[in-house]
A protein has these predicted regions:
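Generic secondary-structure boundary/loop-capping signal
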Residues: 7, 16, 41, 68, ...
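Charged, alpha-helix-enriched surfaces in structured cytosolic catalytic cores
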Residues: 1, 5, 47, 66, ...
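Positively charged, polar, low-complexity stretches
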Residues: 24, 28-29, 42, 47-73
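Structural motif
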Residues: 36-37, 62-64, 79-82
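A conserved hydrophobic position in a structured secondary element of the catalytic/binding core
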Residues: 21, 66, 84-85
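C-terminal structural segments of small proteins and small subunits
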Residues: 70-97
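N-terminal first-folded block
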Residues: 2-37
Length: 97
């Protein structure tokens, strides 16, 4: 994974309003079929990671486990998960994996 490019795209998603943060928001986005990619920080707890992965498996949403701390470093927002709305930005992020 090209971390430098991924960080840039993550920041762009936030500025463009294409990112959803928080457990409830991410779960709603994935369950509602609005999420093109779910990014999980490497510091996420094992139980939370499993819950997100099970939900994404049921809905067919791609999940990526990032390096610890990368999510906050790239977006400036603390948290364990970021849902990227479906569209060209999520497709670009998938292409750099």
């Amino acid at each position: 994974m090209d971390e430098r490019r991924m960080k840039g795209l993550m920041g762009l998603c936030v500025r463009a309003g294409q990112a959803v943060f928080g457990e409830d928001g991410c779960r709603r986005s994935v369950a509602g079929g609005q999420c093109g990619l779910l990014l999980l920080d490497g510091d996420i707890s094992e139980n939370s990671r499993k819950r997100y992965e099970e939900l994404c498996e049921r809905t067919g949403t791609r999940t990526v486990l990032l390096s610890p701390g990368l999510l906050e470093e790239a977006t400036g927002k603390p948290g364990a998960a970021m849902a990227v709305k479906e569209g060209s930005l999520s497709e670009q992020m998938i292409s750099c994996l």
